[in-house]
């Protein structure tokens, strides 16, 4: 399985970037995981870049209105989507205005991290942490804090 986190916007905040890098490193002990940052811009420009970043993958749009999943269901969903096709699962996070509607509509599934609205950079950290948690759950390992 390979995971892709494609997100609009660059994370410049050093502590936030360090936390993301820590969890990405932990995920990579289990599976390949790429993070792709896409420059923010109008939907007509961002949409094709997100589509290219997720080409050939099962695509999960991360949105407030998506399916609300607990950690166990999230892990099971990662495993289910990862076992299909090429074994690549791409998680898409939009910018401040969310994902372009055509990108959301083309996704294979839509998930939510919370009914709360997070700044998109914080949502990316929460997603990456949940992907690490999913890896530990799928292997029956204790979660390393």
From Swiss-Prot:
Its EC number is 2.1.1.177. It is found in: Cytoplasm. It comes from the Bacteria. It catalyses: pseudouridine(1915) in 23S rRNA + S-adenosyl-L-methionine = N(3)-methylpseudouridine(1915) in 23S rRNA + S-adenosyl-L-homocysteine + H(+). Pfam families: SPOUT_MTase (PF02590). InterPro entries: Alpha/beta_knot_MTases, RlmH-like, tRNA_m1G_MTases_N. GO terms for cellular component: cytoplasm. GO terms for molecular function: rRNA (pseudouridine-N3-)-methyltransferase activity. The keyword S-adenosyl-L-methionine applies. The keyword DNA-binding does not apply. Belongs to the RNA methyltransferase RlmH family. Homodimer. Specifically methylates the pseudouridine at position 1915 (m3Psi1915) in 23S rRNA. This is Ribosomal RNA large subunit methyltransferase H. It comes from Sorangium cellulosum (strain So ce56).
């Amino acid at each position: 399985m390979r995971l892709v986190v494609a997100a609009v916007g660059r994370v410049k905040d050093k502590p936030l970037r360090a936390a993301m890098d820590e969890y990405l490193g932990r995920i990579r002990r289990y599976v390949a995981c790429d993070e792709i940052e896409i420059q923010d811009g109008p939907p007509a420009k961002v949409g094709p870049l997100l589509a290219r970043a997720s080409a050939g993958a099962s695509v999960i749009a991360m949105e407030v209105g998506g399916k609300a999943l607990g950690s166990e269901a999230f892990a099971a969903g990662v495993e289910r989507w990862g076992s299909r096709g090429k074994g690549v699962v791409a998680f898409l996070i939009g910018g401040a205005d969310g994902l372009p509607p055509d990108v959301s509509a083309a996704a294979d599934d839509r998930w939510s991290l919370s009914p709360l609205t997070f700044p998109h950079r914080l949502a990316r950290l929460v997603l990456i942490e949940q992907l690490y948690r999913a890896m530990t759950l799928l292997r029956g390992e204790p979660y390393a804090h």
